[in-house]
């Protein structure tokens, strides 16, 4: 029984002493990683604006190409709300103020001519 206690005590002392050493090593490793991380963060801070500028340039380029090759916008069908200043009603339809059923909507709708 005493040998079990002595063995347990010996293992406990070794675990505590090695645990302290590991704790110090871990602390030093964390300091090294944070120092390396600062360099990485500086690199990332410089890289991020460059990437954003590249993406923005690509998007603007796509928009300009799209506007050159764009087709006419789709038209609005009958009985659908439209904008009186920019009517996009299909051919044969006109953007008019509603009569009877839609008076309370305060909007314009596409109607047949």
Swiss-Prot record:
GO CC list: extracellular region
Basic and acidic residues bias: start-end ranges: 59-69
Tissue expression summary: Expressed by the venom gland.
Compartment(s): Secreted
Single GO term (MF): sodium channel inhibitor activity
Signal sequence segment: 1-21
Keyword flag Signal: yes
Propeptide feature: residues: 22-74
Keywords: Disulfide bond, Ion channel impairing toxin, Knottin, Secreted, Signal, Toxin
Entry similarity comment: Belongs to the neurotoxin 14 (magi-1) family. 01 (HNTX-16) subfamily.
Protein name according to UniProt: U11-theraphotoxin-Hhn1a
Organism, as annotated: Cyriopagopus hainanus (Chinese bird spider)
UniProt lineage: Eukaryota, Metazoa, Ecdysozoa, Arthropoda, Chelicerata
